[in-house]
Design a protein with these regions (language model features):
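A short helix->loop->beta-strand "cap" motif at the edges of active sites that frequently abuts
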Residues: 75-80
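Short, structured active-site "lid" loops
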Residues: 45-69, 73-74
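Short acidic, S/G/P-rich loop/turn micro-motifs used as interaction or catalytic elements
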Residues: 36, 57-61, 217-219
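Gly/His-enriched, cation/cofactor- and phosphate-binding structural elements
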Residues: 2, 183-313
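Short alpha-helices
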Residues: 92-160
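Divalent metal-coordination and catalytic microenvironments
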Residues: 10, 20, 55, 84, ...
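Anionic-ligand anchoring segments at beta-strand to alpha-helix junctions in alpha/beta enzyme folds, i.e.
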Residues: 2-46
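Glycine-rich, Lys/Arg-enriched anion-binding loops that position phosphate/diphosphate groups
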Residues: 129, 136-223
């Protein structure tokens, strides 16, 4: 059986993939992606494969394309197993189940917890606890902060795959390899936080304070950046803009509704969506006119906030 993994790029996604690897001992292909690109990754899966999707929810704008590729894999003798903990519409669950997808959606834990629970992977409690600590923002296991920095230290698939294989053998110990990487990561991270605090801007929308920041592609730790900005500026919503996508964080408001209206999804307090800038905006970005791009990005969010009645001027 050709086994293919498609998972998210953060600690929870990498840990989920590590548990799949631990269960079967071998994966033929490993893909890391964001929810808005899931259909693209699925399109590259060979016919007849056993596909394992972890820590990725559905973006409604690409749902039809996702179904097309799922049908192709299943009709060619393959299988699709999907493990997630984000908020799903009942119609999505029903449609995928009817196609023949083995779907496990459980919001009571993180994605690694879902994989652990439904695949019955032995001796993996330590990794699950660490992943959930960070992903669910519980902060009840210090190792989660170490592992998230290890996973996010370098961008790109090769480092993520190295980290995934490392975590497949995680026994709860933070060894010297991980701690050395974390030490370097913290130095980089502090510079990123300092930059974000200096460059972030504020907008008001009917009493809702929105802090926004345009994040460089190499800057990871979106939730950490958002959390710092929410605290520093006493904001209701943090908008983290990137080239091609957007992340929303809040402690009090349901940002999933905003993300959903933009074709995305996620959790009530942490959500995201893809951004499709026109040629002018793309040129602004590549020419270094980042402030204009950031304004365009936050304006799209404010427009959706108004339409979902989260605020009104």
């Amino acid at each position: 059986v050709r086994r293919v993994l498609i998972t998210h790029t953060d600690l929870d996604g990498v840990a989920s993939g590590a548990l799949i690897l631990k269960k079967f001992g071998h994966l033929d292909r490993i893909y890391f992606t964001q929810p808005h690109n899931l259909h693209v990754r699925l399109a590259g899966v060979p016919n007849g494969s056993a596909v394992y999707i972890t820590d990725i929810g559905v973006n409604k704008t690409s749902f039809d394309k996702i179904k097309e590729n799922v049908k192709r894999v299943l009709s060619s003798g393959g299988e699709v197993f999907w493990f997630d903990h984000h908020v799903w519409e009942e119609s999505w669950i029903k449609e995928l189940a009817e196609l023949g997808v083995s779907l496990y959606v459980d919001r009571s834990t993180c994605s690694a917890g879902v994989v652990y629970k439904y695949l019955g992977i032995e001796a993996s409690e330590e990794l699950v606890r660490a992943a959930c600590s960070v992903d669910l923002w519980l902060m009840n296991d210090w190792r989660g902060n170490f592992l998230s920095r290890y996973v996010g230290y370098v961008g790109g698939a090769s480092w993520k795959e190295k980290a995934l294989k490392k975590l497949a053998g995680f026994d709860g110990t933070i060894d010297s390899e991980i701690s050395d990487v974390v030490e370097k990561a913290i130095t980089k991270e502090l510079k990123i936080y300092d930059k974000a605090l200096k460059k972030a801007k504020i907008r008001e929308c009917g009493g809702v304070k929105v802090v926004y920041y345009l994040k460089d592609q190499e800057e990871h730790l979106t939730s950490y950046i958002a959390n710092i900005l929410l605290s520093r500026y006493e904001a209701d919503i943090a908008v983290i803009c990137r080239r091609g996508s957007i992340s929303l964080r809040s402690r009090t408001l349901n940002v999933r509704e905003v993300a959903l209206s933009m074709g995305g999804g996620g959790h009530p307090r942490a959500a995201g969506a893809s951004l499709k800038p026109d040629l002018v905006r793309r040129l602004m970005y590549f020419l270094g006119l980042r402030s204009f791009y950031a304004e365009w990005c936050v304006n799209k969010v404010l427009k959706q906030l108004e339409s979902t009645q989260a605020c009104s001027d």
